[in-house]
């Protein structure tokens, strides 16, 4: 099951090479999610629920950038139902024009071939702890 989970995570991030590709692939990426998927973000701890909520989160996030891409650095099989994805967000803010480059982590829980939960982290220690891993 673990290799299958890594493959699902890989498909989730495939269109992340550009903002345009992410938006165009939204129906395909949402199909990888369980209808009641949950995504918790670190900014304020908000949890977006359901495919519609997750889709809205992605669209709002992408709207805050003129240019955006997500570069997967590695996908770690955590065993069981989880994979930890380390990535780099690269973009230019829509309002400020400022260049952004930031590392983040997303812990995906996958059951029966579908993403059921995404927890996002900006702190390496927090991400590895949540995944039950050591850095």
What are these regions (language model features)?
Residues 1-4, 8, 59-135:
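A beta-strand edge to alpha-helix "cap/lid" segment located at domain peripheries
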Residues 12-16, 40, 92:
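Alpha-helix C-capping/helix-to-loop hinge sites
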